[in-house]
Amino acid sequence: FLTIEEKSDAIVSLTEGDSKEWNADCKRKFVIPNSIPEIPPGTSPRTAQRAISAGRLTKEKAFHRMIAAWMKVYRIHPEWQLDIYGEGEEKKVLLHTIKALGLEGVVRIHPFSTDLEQEFLDSSMFLLSSLYEGFGLVLIEAMACGLPCIAFDCPYGPGEIIHHNKDGVLLPDFDKLSTDAHELWTMAWSVNKLISNPSLREKLGNAARENAKRF
């Protein structure tokens, strides 16, 4: 039987990481990342006391990691809020986690927004906690609005979009099943650092907007 590679004229992947998963004998491999239609005319002033995230509320998006990390943010910066936009089968579990951690009114889950761009413009940073991604287009959409992004270096996408400490923060991807491991401290620490340093938010956010132009 012929393999997929042998049957195909070419293999097109969204990321270099995914491309490497294919048979090395495949001679015609191309990487064509997703893109955004245009760079929005507006840029977030990054002054709102609000972080944002968006995506399907499913296990692979691992919003539980983000919510658990926010508990550590809340202890230092109780005035800040985390708004998550999305729907999915994990919604009830996540709402229960929010309540159990005493974060009701602090971490809020909203339905998918028809104007996510405006939500980005009304926020100061974007968070991604996925266990894996097909690409991570939402990162580029947030960066195009001038938001510094904090994401785990999961397969695949974030590591090929974010330049660590230049236009965002790329976190090591530790134990993917844990909610209390070192990974939560790294996300919380990074969020707290951006909250405490508006000039760093501005620097990373401006660089993020420029980086988004690659796509």
What are these regions (language model features)?
Residues 148-152:
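Short hydrophobic beta-strand element within catalytic cores of glycosyltransferases
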Residues 17, 35:
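Carbohydrate-associated surface elements
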Residues 49, 56-72, 89-95, 185:
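A conserved mid-protein helix/loop that constitutes part of the nucleotide-sugar donor-binding site
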Residues 199-215:
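A charged, aromatic-enriched C-terminal amphipathic alpha-helix characteristic of glycosyltransferases
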Residues 117, 135, 140-144, 159-160, ...:
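Short alpha-helical segment that forms part of, or immediately flanks, the ligand-binding pocket
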Residues 1-9:
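A conserved, positively charged/aromatic
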Residues 112, 131:
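Aromatic "clamp/platform" in nucleotide-sugar-dependent glycosyltransferases that forms part
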